[in-house]
Amino acid sequence: MDFSPFDNRGYPTLSVRDGYSAWAETYEDTVLDLMDLRVAEALTSVAWHEHAEALDLACGTGRFGAWLRAMGVGAVDGVDITPAMLERAKARGAYRLLMTGEVAAVDRPGEVYSLVCQSLADEHLSDLGPLYAEAYRLAAPGGLFVILGYHPWFLMNGMPTHFRDRSGRDLAIESHIHLFADHVAAALKADWRLAELKEALVDEAWIAAKPKWAVHRGRPISFGWVWRKRA
């Protein structure tokens, strides 16, 4: 769904590659673990330490890949379209392999990974279908696809993914709205089976970190889907 009719910020909008290239230096100073890592920690259908190989789609600076390793995942590969983000991921030393490329066309053989993940990136895709199909191709039989994201409620209330650059300008990154029905349709078309869904709300921990967000108390801020491939 086109985000522009919902936009109430009016920030200049960059492409995904240009936006994350500009944001790479300060990304981890502005993205809170509350957005995705806390949701991942709450998932009960994933025994992270049991996975020998995982793929991190749109791995960015590697913060999620590093979390996966800390949770006991044996080896993590990552792919991202932004070289500046991949440089930071490489510096972490958490990845076995890092690749430059699109999340819907990964240069890896199929049915390799028992765990495929994506965190905070789905809103940058105009169509979820290719993502879910590629994750299914890459997942081993019985494998999982964990997708964590920015809740469409906030996008539909006018707040795109955005950041402040060195000069103090607020800039948005190309965003699209995907209803939960869109996720379900794309997943079922690819033959995934739902294992779990979690939604996170703006709570006291959020408000402590961002006091101005008190006006958003109780609103859904992020989500976590877990999908399972047939064995």
Across the structure, where does each feature detected by a protein language model lie?
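A short SAM/SAH-binding and catalytic strip from SAM-dependent methyltransferases
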Residues: 115-127
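Short alpha-helix
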Residues: 175-198
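A short glycine-rich, Lys/Arg-flanked "PGG" loop and its adjoining helix->strand segment in the class I
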Residues: 129-141
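Class I SAM-dependent methyltransferase SAM/SAH-binding core
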Residues: 55-57, 61-105
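A short acidic, Gly/Pro-enriched loop at the edge of an enzyme's catalytic core
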Residues: 104-116
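Core SAM-dependent methyltransferase catalytic element
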Residues: 210-231
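Conserved class I S-adenosyl-L-methionine
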Residues: 1-49, 63, 67, 144-174, 207
